From Swiss-Prot:
The chain crosses the membrane at residues 2-22, 32-52, 61-81. GO terms for molecular function: oxidoreductase activity, acting on NAD(P)H, quinone or similar compound as acceptor; quinone binding. It catalyses: a plastoquinone + NADH + (n+1) H(+)(in) = a plastoquinol + NAD(+) + n H(+)(out); a plastoquinone + NADPH + (n+1) H(+)(in) = a plastoquinol + NADP(+) + n H(+)(out). This is NAD(P)H-quinone oxidoreductase subunit 4L, chloroplastic. NDH is composed of at least 16 different subunits, 5 of which are encoded in the nucleus. Its main location: plastid. Belongs to the complex I subunit 4L family. It comes from the Eukaryota. It is found in: Plastid, Chloroplast thylakoid membrane. Keywords: Chloroplast, Membrane, NAD, NADP, Plastid, Plastoquinone, Quinone, Thylakoid, Translocase, Transmembrane, Transmembrane helix, Transport. NDH shuttles electrons from NAD(P)H:plastoquinone, via FMN and iron-sulfur (Fe-S) centers, to quinones in the photosynthetic chain and possibly in a chloroplast respiratory chain. The immediate electron acceptor for the enzyme in this species is believed to be plastoquinone. Couples the redox reaction to proton translocation, and thus conserves the redox energy in a proton gradient. GO terms for biological process: ATP synthesis coupled electron transport; photosynthesis, light reaction.
Amino acid sequence: MMLEHVLVLSAYLFSIGIYGLITSRNMVRALMCLELILNAVNINFVTFSDFFDNRQLKGDIFSIFVIAIAAAEAAIGLAIVSSIYRNRKSTRINQSNLLNN
């Protein structure tokens, strides 16, 4: 596969993630868009690692590290969303400002 095709795919995924993160009003959807952004970055890491440096696996190892961090971020984010839903009965971002009492 050519480098340009993979980079265009990654740019599309990144753009969709940014658009969804900006326009999302639901916390779960915002977390999903953030994961989409991180996956686009992982595609770039693996692509550049394969294209420019075949012998060293720095991009591959770094993408595995990003996947592990993203999994922890998703678990913590979903736990926070679950806690907010239990207290506020809503997962909408604009209704969950916990600093206003």
